[in-house]
UniProtKB/Swiss-Prot annotation:
This is Homogentisate solanesyltransferase, chloroplastic. Involved in the synthesis of plastoquinone-9. Can use both homogentisic acid and 2,5-dihydroxyphenylacetic acid gamma-lactone as prenyl acceptors, and solanesyl diphosphate > farnesyl diphosphate > geranylgeranyl diphosphate >> phytyl diphosphate as prenyl donors. Do not catalyze the decardoxylation of homogentisate uncoupled from prenylation. It comes from the Eukaryota. Belongs to the UbiA prenyltransferase family. Keywords: Chloroplast, Membrane, Plastid, Transferase, Transit peptide, Transmembrane, Transmembrane helix. The gene is HST. Gene3D superfamilies: UbiA prenyltransferase. InterPro entries: AtHST-like, UbiA_prenyltransferase, UbiA_sf. Seeds overexpressing HST accumulate increased levels of tocopherol. It comes from Arabidopsis thaliana.
Length: 386
């Protein structure tokens, strides 16, 4: 440790290694400090004992000030409202519990279909429809939350291997709280639909909840069987969502249900797309599925084969969309539909190539699956303008 004393009333301590003046031919005073002798320059003198004490007092006073200030900062950090902190953590856990990427798909899909129905019937648009549309979106989010939530409750062991970041698997949300949330989502969704959309749409909504239940809950737990699992996901996310939202929107406009070519296209397109999502969603989970003896196409056929199968089915979708634009120019805007789907198909081919070059690592598989969801969002964003 070095003690430097100068003419100014400042005292400087350093924890660096001693850097003292080398011994010279001239005699210099020294000060004994903690068993060590520190050489001092010749012109430095302690004029009186009081000066030394004043300097010691200065150092001690400043040390106490710094110490008090540091302690007060620590105390302030520790005195943050624990209730607000718990609320923030619970909100974060609930948001992760809802699986945000599925919420985005549900919200975009319903918004796109409502927008398309309104574009086809602009003369029937009125402000009272906004509240009805928002209530429908709320019901869909509740249904989505119920389905993904109950799946997490029955997949805790698997998620600790495959998805340890999910709130129940991570210990951020208790099973009891999760049950309360899924029960709330189911009841709230059914009430909103029942009061706003009539018995037929309520029946479709109930069917979606039922399919989501048997997908995850024993003894049926249909997710154990690949074909049944794919059909359930494709039915709920593909057909029921698109048909139900479009039917409800036309009913709110006072119109009978009638298929239009664009709506038939998006329903078919998204149903096949949902099938691809159902196939590829197990790609990042192969390790946990094998450990818990869950039979999926990925565990049976291998990650590479399923990735190529998923990409191939999506390419069929894109080729069909481009063909429709050529075949029905009076229905679809070919100037948008053709180049947009060429770009999306090219992106899919490139992402599949990236996955192949990465040798199907877990990170590359996760990136590929996220890209598929981005393609899903992109189709709904395009749909109102096709």
């Amino acid at each position: 440790m070095e003690l430097s004393i100068s003419q100014s009333p400042r005292v400087r301590f350093s924890s660096l290694a001693p850097r003292f003046l080398a011994a010279s031919h001239h005699h210099r005073p020294s000060v004994h400090l903690a068993g060590k002798f520190i050489s001092l320059p010749r012109d430095v003198r302690f004029t009186s004992l009081s000066t030394s004490r004043m300097r010691s007092k200065f150092v001690s006073t400043n040390y106490r000030k710094i110490s008090i200030r540091a302690c007060s900062q620590v105390g302030a950090a520790e005195s943050d409202d624990p209730v607000l902190d718990r609320i923030a953590r619970f909100q974060n856990a609930c948001w992760r519990f809802l699986r945000p990427h599925t919420i985005r798909g549900t919200a975009l899909g319903s918004t796109a279909l409502v927008t398309r129905a309104l574009i086809e019937n602009t003369h029937l648009i009125k402000w009272s429809l906004v509240l009805k549309a928002l209530s429908g979106l709320l019901a869909l989010i509740c249904g989505n939350g119920y389905i993904v939530g109950i799946n997490q409750i029955y997949d805790i062991g698997i998620d600790k291997v495959n998805k340890p970041y999910l709130p129940i698997a991570a210990g951020d949300l208790s099973v009891q709280s999760a049950w309360l949330l899924v029960i709330f989502f189911a009841i709230a969704g059914l009430l909103v639909v029942g009061f706003n959309f009539g018995p037929f749409i309520t029946s479709l909504y109930s069917l979606g909840l039922f399919l989501g239940t048997i997908y995850s809950v024993p003894p049926l737990r249909m997710k154990r069987f690949p074909v049944a699992a794919f059909l359930i996901i494709a039915t709920v996310r593909g057909f029921l969502l698109n048909f139900g939202v479009y039917h409800a929107t036309r009913a709110a406009l006072g119109l009978p249900f009638q298929w239009s070519a664009p709506v038939a296209f998006i329903t078919s397109f998204v149903t096949l797309f949902a099938l691809v999502i159902a196939i590829t969603k197990d790609l990042p989970d192969v390790e946990g599925d094998r450990k818990f003896q869950i039979s999926t196409l990925a565990t049976k056929l291998g990650v590479r084969n399923i990735a190529f199968l998923g990409s191939g089915l999506l390419l069929v979708n894109y080729v069909s969309a481009i063909s429709l634009a050529f075949y029905m120019p009076q229905v679809f805007r070919g100037s948008l539909m053709i180049p947009a789907h060429v770009i999306l198909a090219s992106g899919l081919i490139f992402q599949t190539w990236v996955l192949e070059k990465a040798n199907y690592t877990k990170e590359a598989i996760s990136g590929y699956y996220r890209f598929i969801w981005n393609l899903f969002y992109a189709e709904y964003l395009l749909f109102p303008f096709l």
